[in-house]
Every structure is written in structure tokens, then in C-alpha cells.
């Protein structure tokens, strides 16, 4: 009997301890693994009200997967107004009227490899993901940072350094068309004397018209040895 009386308090303590452990377990929240969030260049474009036409263009050109991949990419993103001007200037009533192959290469002309913030951009040439039809070589783009940031002399950055997980986005105010020899001669100030020489009123040949001929159309393509202003000695 005495032994039984000794055992009862021990059992009560054990039961109390067990109940306390169960209560602690019941109050614990179930484990929820952390789900990584993504914010790709495509996500940035989808979330921007002034880039809806760009998103539609990427979908039509089947480039969504490309720009959602690892990268890194620097994307020059034309605004809705920029696309509207591009469509109007080229005689298209809507994005659907632009041939897919043309649209794809134009969009790729806005993509540069690497993550280039505005402070990383310097005056000079860079390679884009657009390719030439003649040799499948990467097309170049001329960057001018003398007064803001301007591309090929036609498109300026209006909103810079929008970060994404796989790169960076700079919103621009004009669609950057596929370049010709004339594009770079006009955009690059080191060729201003050459441009002046080729556009003199007394010339009988329309050099600008000839050198603007698209690849695949005679007499293109061209290889031009372009003297700089220093070469002219001016």
C-alpha cells in the first residue's frame, strides 16, 4: 500500500509533463518551405503600365521564355508611345501587321548581353542579340552618353535601372530600328565630316540612299572604310 502511494504522484507528474509537451506541439505552426520569388525581365514588363505593347510584342515573337531565362540581359524597353510611333511611321495599323521575323529581330536589337546599369554604359558600340540576314552576325548598336543615354541617335533612356533577377531594364522613348551603314555614320559624331562629304549638294550620286539599301536588295551588302574626323584632318 505504501509503495502504491509513492507511485501515484510519479504517474501524475509524468502525465502532466506529457500533456504539456503535447500542448506545445499542438501550438506549433506547420513547416512551410520558403518559396523563392522571381522577378524576371518579363515580370518587370508585365508589371509596367507603359510596357503593355512590348509584352504583346514579346508574346507574338515568342521571346517570353528567352527573356525569362537566366541571362543576364540588358533590355532597352520601348514604351507604348514608342511602339505607336513605330507602327505609324512604318505603315502598320497594329502590332499584328508586323511580320513575325521582322518583329523578332527588331526586339532582339533592344537586348544586350550582361547587366549594364546606366553608369556602366559608355560612348561606343555594343553587340545586340539581333542578327544580320547576310551572315547571321550580331548587329551593333551605338551608345552615346554625351547628353544622357542615346542609342543609334534615335532613342533615349527615359527611365533607367529597373532591376530584374536576370538583368536590368531601361525604358526608351523610341523603337530602335535595324541599323544600316548610314545609321552609324549619322549617329556617331566622329563621322560628321564623312556625312557632310556624302551629302554635299553638288554630288550626282545619292550616297545616303545607296548606303541605306537593305541587305538582300542590290547593291547591298556593303563594307565601308569610314574615315573619322581626325582622318580628314578637320
Regions found by a protein language model. Name each.
Residues 21-234:
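Mature, structured domains of secreted/extracytosolic soluble proteins
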